[in-house]
Curated annotation (Swiss-Prot):
Ligand binding (substrate): 301-307
Protein name: Adenylosuccinate synthetase
Pathway, per record: Purine metabolism; AMP biosynthesis via de novo pathway; AMP from IMP: step 1/2
Reaction catalysed by this enzyme: IMP + L-aspartate + GTP = N(6)-(1,2-dicarboxyethyl)-AMP + GDP + phosphate + 2 H(+)
SMART domains to which the protein is assigned, alphabetical: Adenylsucc_synt (SM00788)
Provenance organism: Bdellovibrio bacteriovorus (strain ATCC 15356 / DSM 50701 / NCIMB 9529 / HD100)
One MF term in the entry's GO annotations: GTP binding
Length: 432
């Protein structure tokens, strides 16, 4: 079995979309296993930029089957528009290329309204939600009252479940947040219309389809969204997303056993970024941070928000390697660090006068740490035209070698630009 999980090893926005698109050349299938339209995966092919939020990043390769698994929360109006844009630009011409699980949870307009109302009510304690309704939709799934993708195709059941949901949601919106309410008839009309458009992609049991594909020798990539440090259980809670972003969730969401996974690839930037609130030990609130932000175009593809930037944090990265069981690493945006006299790498933290090398479990402790920085000589050469590893300047290879020795996990892929061709391979993705 050739299952490979691709997981974000930082706070998201590591470049997983580009990597999945590159990997998909050698894969038969890409499975998106968690999150929702809060993800923004940017792909650049032949100079054309495509931003995906729900559709798996393998969709730009016509021969690759893409699956949205049970653990994803789907805004049906958003995915309808995303599919239309793909079709209008020449992609997804065959509906059999995209399969959507019947048991995936729906994000409905009242989820987004609740998300926005709650964030506004938090005042100074904002989490930094994207306002896409992700959290409220996952809440409904956990409380066993979610409306699923398959419900769209059963009008009577959809009406019954929607009316029950609105009894609670409208009460909350009106009485707790003084907001507008929703009418069941209007929502049902809109949902039935979008159901017709999405019907060609409906798949009752994606778990069975994925399992059969793996057993027949197909190469399957599992695409995560966000990053390890945003995991609901093992991230910097409460400054996290509402799903498990770890590699282990690929199996649970897709409905396969862990023995199906051959390797776990952790994706990280050559520096660190974070969007929204929460601790960020290596954050640079100076001209260097602004330069990294500008050179890396560090603005969210989903929200447009600027990303906080800082030096690479090896304490957090080693934590991600441990909790995911990462076997191989991919370093993205190495080209962005061109032009710095020296490059900082955080190798430890100082907390209350003591040096620590393990990530604190409390975000409030993490907020107090001071990064212990080691300095590596920088380089001035433009890396975006580099075609082979041997063409990299010596200071750059020294940086790569230093990180590899510190992390104890091989760096197999290095990205030096947004395009497919700007990818350097140390070792092939699949073993066979």
């Amino acid at each position: 079995m050739s299952g490979v999980v691709v997981v974000g090893a930082q706070w998201g926005d590591e470049g997983k979309g580009k990597l999945i698109d590159v990997f998909a050349e050698k894969a038969d299938m890409v499975v998106r296993y968690q999150g929702g339209a809060n993800a923004g995966h940017t792909l650049v092919v032949n100079g054309q930029k495509t931003v995906l939020h729900l559709v798996p990043s393998g969709i730009l390769r016509p021969e690759t089957t893409c699956v949205i698994a049970s653990g994803v929360v789907i805004d049906v109006f958003s995915i309808r528009d995303e599919i239309k844009k793909l079709k209008d630009t020449g992609f997804l011409q065959n509906p059999k290329q995209l399969l959507i699980s019947d048991t995936a949870t729906l994000i409905l307009p009242y989820h987004k309204a609740l998300d926005a109302a709650r964030e506004a009510a938090l005042s100074d304690g904002k989490i930094g939600t994207t306002g896409k309704g992700i959290g409220p939709a996952y809440e409904d799934r956990a409380s066993r009252r979610a409306i699923l993708f398959g419900d769209l195709f059963d009008k009577d059941n959809l009406k019954k479940k929607l009316e029950l949901a609105l009894t609670e949601k409208n009460f909350m919106l009106e009485n707790y947040y003084k907001g507008s309410t929703f009418k069941a008839d209007d929502l049902i009309k809109d949902l039935l219309a979008v159901a017709e458009e999405l019907a060609p992609y409906r798949t009752k049991d994606t778990s069975l389809f994925i399992s059969k594909s793996l057993k027949s020798g197909k190469r399957v990539l599992f695409e995560g969204a966000q990053g390890t440090m945003l995991d609901i259980l093992h991230g910097t809670y409460p400054f996290v997303t509402s799903s498990s972003t770890l590699a282990s969730n690929a199996c649970a969401s897709a409905g396969i056993g862990p023995a199906s996974v051959q390797k776990v690839i952790g994706v990280f930037k050559a520096y660190t970024t974070r969007v929204g609130s929460g601790p960020f030990p290596t954050e640079l609130n100076d001209e260097i941070g602004k330069k990294i932000q500008a050179d890396g175009h560090e603005f969210g593809s989903t929200t447009g928000r600027s990303r906080r930037c800082g030096w690479l944090d090896l304490v957090a990265l080693k934590y991600a390697i441990r909790v995911n069981g990462i076997t191989n690493l991919a370093m993205m945006k190495l080209d962005v660090l061109t032009g710095h006299d020296r490059i900082g790498v955080c190798t430890a933290y100082k907390l209350n006068g003591e040096i620590i090398t393990d990530l604190p479990t409390s975000p409030y402790e993490l907020e107090k740490v001071e990064p212990v920085i080691e300095w590596i000589p920088g380089w001035t050469q433009d890396l975006t035209k580099v075609k082979t590893l041997s063409d990299l300047p010596r200071p750059t290879t020294n940086y790569i070698d230093y990180l590899g020795s510190q992390l104890g996990t091989p760096i197999d892929v290095i990205s030096v630009g947004p395009g497919r061709e700007q990818t350097l391979w140390v070792k092939p993705l699949f073993n066979n």
